[in-house]
Design a protein with these regions (language model features):
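Acidic/proline-rich low-complexity IDRs
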Residues: 2, 19-20, 40
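A structural boundary/capping signal
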Residues: 30-339
Length: 339
């Protein structure tokens, strides 16, 4: 009986100790309650590359933002779209011919789409700031997209058609990388009808450092796992930034970086999350001298982490956009849309 009481006392002490450590942020990951979103994302990211279904991954992540999303129904809709492209291309079509039919199916007006093609939302949300505009189901419903939703649909359909297509990034922008039957890679700009664009064009319109190119954070085709970690998870990170949940942002960014260590978006989101925590601290204590002694260590840790993650991004070649970056980006989008 004394042993049972002793064990119970030890257990209570351990629980109290773990609670204290949790408050300090140093509880081992396995000892903490696993956040449901983290559990879902980890299951996706721990799949072997050939087992990753990008369409399902996208919808599972989007459903964390909008629980009303019908995953199976949307997958069935994608299958119907892919079947229509395959039938139009014919049984003996080469990869490049199927890609051209897919491009026309999505972006040219015709009876196959009731003369309502998918188009870039130049007037409504051209910079892709609205979370809803990045959800696949919203894009399918409205046919108005941005540089997240538009390449996403193209890649998901291309992969269902057996084409070698994936995502690539330039600063604040995603596009499609496609390799044809000859082994040649093309950049396809879905915001302007899926037409090819040269590397030099992206490097001119969305400037990137030689260091960034050397480190592969821009312009290269992403693996499926990298695509999930950055293109798809980044929408969830934006959702939690908008919701004012920086701790959640940090936890999700950590998971993304675990599987894609060069994920610039996750680094920047993590740095921004620490800024939000610093801002909350400063709202509570307007002057540094107002911070109680027992909380100063945490405040300094927040400042260090805020600097750390921006410095990590800069070390890979990322640079802070200047004041005119958004205006130049808009001009680029208008230019490619008119070509």
């Amino acid at each position: 009986m004394d042993l049972v009481k002793g064990a119970a006392k030890v257990a209570r002490a351990m629980v109290a100790c773990m609670a204290m450590l949790a408050c300090m942020g140093i509880v081992p990951a396995h000892a903490q309650r696993v956040d449901p979103d983290i559990r879902v994302l980890r299951a996706l990211l721990e799949k072997a590359e050939p087992e990753i279904d990008l369409a399902r991954a996208k919808l599972v992540i989007d459903q964390l933002i909008d629980p009303t999303i019908d995953i199976e129904g949307t997958l069935a809709k994608l299958d119907v779209m892919a079947a229509a492209v395959r039938a139009s291309a014919g049984p003996r079509a080469k990869s490049s011919e199927i890609a051209q039919v897919l491009r026309s199916y999505l972006y040219d007006a015709g009876p196959w789409n009731n003369r309502q093609p998918f188009r870039f939302d130049l007037e409504g949300d051209p910079l892709g700031h609205k979370i809803a505009g990045k959800l696949l189901t919203n894009y399918l419903a409205t046919k108005k997209g941005n540089c997240v939703s538009m390449p996403t649909l193209f890649v998901l359909l291309a992969q269902r058609l057996g084409l070698e297509a994936t995502f690539a990034a330039s600063p604040n922008h995603y596009f499609v990388k496609y390799r044809d039957e000859t082994g040649r890679w093309y950049n396809l700009e879905t915001t302007s009808g899926g037409h090819p664009r040269r590397d030099e064009s992206y490097q001119r319109d969305t400037p990137m450092t030689p260091q960034a190119l050397k480190n592969g954070i821009y312009m290269r085709p992403l693996s499926k796992k990298e695509s999930v970690a950055t293109v798809m998870v980044d929408v969830l990170l934006d959702h939690y930034k908008d919701a004012g949940k920086p701790e959640k942002v940090i936890a999700i960014a950590d998971l993304a970086l675990e599987h894609y260590p060069s994920d610039i978006d996750a680094m920047l989101d993590k740095g921004y999350a620490y800024y939000l925590l610093i801002r909350d601290f400063q709202n509570k204590y307007p002057m540094p001298r107002d911070i109680p002694p027992e909380e100063r260590q945490r405040f300094r840790a927040l400042e260090r982490n805020n600097r750390l993650w921006y410095e990590k991004a800069e070390a890979l070649g990322w640079r802070e956009p200047d004041a005119g970056a958004d205006a130049r980006y808009m001009e680029m989008l208008k230019s490619v849309k008119s070509n």
